[in-house]
A protein has these predicted regions:
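Compact structured core domains
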Residues: 24-76
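A generic structural signal for ordered secondary structure
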Residues: 19, 24, 54, 126-127
Length: 171
């Protein structure tokens, strides 16, 4: 069955962090987030997602099952990153952070500055892009930390960031 560009599908996953909502456009994962009292559906910008079993959700469940067993998954589900070019680039860089490792906002900023051939990039700008990540856990924004190893904010809450880093034995 072909899906239109506006189709949005959702499926839920019970994780050690709480219930997660997986969102897809029918072929790629477009969102993964914790279901909150505000409801994950509110994050889908006014669309009415259909709950449906899709291959991308099956792949994502396999990835999450492996991850929550404390193993680095051997594959990444097909992702469709959203946001500005800068936000997408930050997400691409986060995808290269190995399981069990962390990097700082400043390290990502320095990498982007080198790529752009500019002297510096703001770590705060990187922080804004990290905070806009729509695909938690798989795009591992929890692996990005502050200068000096300081743990800083996480959209799903600091206690969950700590839980994920402990699972990966990063702290």
């Amino acid at each position: 069955m072909r899906h239109t560009a506006t189709d949005t599908f959702i499926q839920f996953y019970d994780s050690p962090l709480g219930k997660l909502a997986m969102r897809s456009d029918g072929s790629a994962l477009i969102g993964l987030g914790l279901v909150s009292k505000q409801a994950a559906v509110a994050a889908i910008a006014g669309s009415r997602p259909q709950e449906k079993s899709l291959l991308i959700f099956q792949e994502t469940v396999r990835w999450l099952d492996s991850y929550f067993r404390g193993r680095a998954p051997s594959f990444t589900p097909k992702l469709k990153l959203s946001g500005s070019d800068f936000q997408k680039r930050v997400c691409e860089i986060m995808l290269t952070i190995p399981f069990g490792k962390t990097v700082t906002y400043g390290e990502i900023a320095a990498r982007i500055a080198r790529e752009r051939g500019i002297p510096r990039m703001s770590a705060q700008a990187v922080g804004g892009a990290v905070g806009a990540n729509p695909i938690l856990i798989i795009v591992p924004c929890h692996r990005v930390i502050g200068a000096g190893g300081n743990l800083t904010g996480y959209g799903a809450g600091m206690e969950r960031k700590i839980q994920l880093l402990k699972l990966e034995k990063s702290i």
